[in-house]
UniProtKB/Swiss-Prot annotation:
Spans traversing the lipid bilayer: 225-245, 253-273, 281-301, 320-340, 361-381, 383-403, 417-437, 450-470
GO CC entries: membrane
Topology in membrane: Multi-pass membrane protein
Function per UniProt: The ubiquitous expression and the conservation of the sequence in distant animal species suggest that the gene codes for a protein with housekeeping functions.
Annotated spans, Disordered: 1-21
Domain of life from the UniProt record: Eukaryota
Similarity comment text for this entry: Belongs to the bile acid:sodium symporter (BASS) (TC 2.A.28) family.
Record protein name field: P3 protein
Entry annotated with the keyword Transcription: no
Length: 477
């Protein structure tokens, strides 16, 4: 028998799922609760009514001592992200013996992403007995159970019976419009975001004033730096993410989130870092724009290839509207800045004076927002994805710099290529995951872009501070 308790339910099950299998009044209370619950126990996939065995002292036909319900159903449905119990009846002789210790039951979920076993406790009722298994469902999927009935009082312990034919099917919960709108409000109604938007626009206009049209024409004639950026962003980084997912044995959802993050184009903050670290700003803006355009083709291609290698079959939706919005958010203020530079040179000089302070304020504000927004998604995060996420920006910086060094590019361009490969547009990855996966899976997979974004911003901020300190101590003559 399978009993369910959804999150937020007011129904309580005292005495079930506790540690140990006591006797006396407590076991009688457990038995009474189980008998009361029989008429509305959960159903299996065949919609068969389940009942608790009466506790025979001889094994049934086929030599099976353990059963769930009447033994006719092997697969049981359960909603995702819920608590509940499984009642396993035991017809092993001596199971209901109240004077001598009975056998022990070991239950293992063979897919812990889908189902986790919290504890197992023995119970007795009437002339029979069994076990209550407390479970917690996670992501939607199918979790086979490995059940072992062991006589732990023998030396060595004796395996009485082993079963692998039961499984729990965790069904996805539907996303309600109210929940979705609440989530959107959580991310979009932050007052700090609205305070930063005017600064972002002015800052991008200032970057437009930094664009050198002659340098831009030269890049069109010799696009090697921009091609290096595409190579690092869409070939090397996704491959690195796939290898790390295999090395650290990341769950499929996390692995997919990491690969999509590493397949994303350069982030809008990359040319901000190029400015603060002495890179080529014109090249940085050009590379960010080009990689964002290329992402409309490379992002779905990379995601499809690695999803197949990971045996993930969800249909992935590329957020074209987000990509177009990113392109416009780059192109319009940059174009305004170029126009200001040509028509209003004095105002252009004023913007150039404030671009670095504005950039630093935006960097701190963006880092603060990222930490605030990631609190809920990053709850319960595990060490492997943290370690991998920390290495992604560092490896990207190293790959980009090595590629640029191989072509003997100027130092400023080497820094820019390095930054473009090392700084991903994690918001695009986040949008793609939220559009493609169900809510619980999407939030789980979204840990990867959040960790990469937080790590990248923190590491780049450390580089900027280190660069300022070094420049102050050892100024270039």
């Amino acid at each position: 028998m399978v009993l369910m308790q959804d999150k937020g339910s007011s129904q309580q099950w005292p005495g079930l799922g506790g540690e140990g299998g006591g006797t006396g009044p407590l076991s009688m209370l457990r038995a009474a609760l189980l008998l009361i619950s029989l008429p509305w126990g959960a159903q299996g996939t065949a919609s068969t009514s389940l009942s608790t065995a009466g506790g025979h002292t001889v094994p049934p036909t086929g030599g099976r001592y353990l059963s769930i319900g009447d033994g006719s159903v092997m697969e049981f449905e359960f909603p995702e992200d819920s608590e509940g119990i499984i009642v396993i009846s035991s017809q092993y002789p001596g199971q209901a013996n109240r004077t001598a210790p009975g056998p022990m039951l070991r239950v293992t979920s063979l897919d812990t992403e889908v189902l986790t076993i919290k504890n197992v406790s023995a119970i007795t009722w009437g002339g029979g007995g069994g076990f209550v298994v407390s479970i917690h469902s996670g992501l939607a999927g199918l979790a086979p159970l490995h059940i072992q009935l062991v006589d732990a009082h023998e030396a060595p312990p004796t395996l009485i019976e082993e079963r692998r034919d039961f499984c729990i099917k965790v069904s996805p919960a539907e996303d309600t419009p109210a929940t979705l709108s609440a989530d959107l409000a959580h991310f979009s109604e932050n007052p700090i975001l609205y305070l930063l938007l005017p600064l972002i626009f002015v800052n991008k206009c200032s970057f437009g004033c930094k664009v050198e049209l002659e340098v831009l024409k030269g890049l069109m004639q010799s696009p090697q730096p921009m091609l290096l950026g595409l190579l690092g962003q869409f070939l090397v980084m996704p491959l690195y993410a796939f290898l790390m997912a295999k090395v650290f044995m990341l769950p499929k959802a996390l692995a997919l989130g990491l690969i999509i993050t590493c397949s994303s184009p350069g982030g809008g903050g990359s040319y901000l870092f190029s400015l603060l670290l002495g890179g080529d700003v014109t090249l940085a803006i050009s590379m960010t724009f080009l990689s964002t355009v290329a992402a409309t083709g490379f992002l779905p291609l990379s995601s499809a290839i690695y999803s197949r290698l990971l045996s993930i079959h969800e249909t992935l939706h590329v957020p074209i509207s987000k990509i177009l919005g990113t392109l416009l958010f780059i192109a319009i203020p940059i174009a305004v800045g170029v126009l200001i530079k040509s028509k209003l040179p004095k105002f252009s000089q004023l913007l150039l004076q404030v671009v670095k302070p504005f950039s630093f304020v935006l960097l701190l504000g963006g880092l603060f927002l990222a930490y605030r927004m990631g609190v809920f998604i990053l709850a319960g995060i595990r060490l492997p994805i943290v370690l991998v996420g920390i290495t992604v920006p560092l490896v990207g910086l190293l790959v980009g710099y090595c590629l640029a060094t191989c072509l003997k590019l100027p130092v400023a361009q080497r820094r820019t290529v390095s930054i473009e490969v090392g700084v991903q547009n994690s918001l695009l990855a986040l949008a793609m995951l939220q559009l493609s996966l169900r809510r619980l899976q999407a939030d789980y997979a979204s840990q990867a872009p959040f960790i990469v974004a937080l790590s990248g911003t923190s590491e780049m901020l450390a580089l900027v501070i280190g660069h300022f300190i070094y420049s102050s101590l050892f100024p270039v003559p």
